[in-house]
Amino acid sequence: MSGTIENNISNQSGSIAVAPAGLNWVSSVVTASTVTVVAGNGYWINTTSNACTITLPSSASAGDTIIFGDYARTWGTNGIVIDSNGLNYQGDDDTFDVEYGTDGQSVEIVYSGATKGWIP
């Protein structure tokens, strides 16, 4: 997408262009019961045959992003479990796993820093 800047409060002119944010979608669909993921990627997770435990990176930088999508709309039957791998998740330490189980759901998580960790 691109366009022209006109009629703005500071009377500026020029052009704009929108570029992708740098997230890469992994081309193969995850069907395994476990997967270790990498920041900067999007993953289609197919839980038709089994639930999937997703292990997050053991280190992260503020702004790191990962997206998961329900490829076959089956998370309600076989959900995903996120293992935060030693980092905080929504401010909670890594003593529990986070579960998502809604058909058709997608989850985008961003690393905010050590205090809150990964935040959806």
Annotate each PLM feature:
Residues D83-D93:
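Short edge-strand/loop segments of extracellular domains
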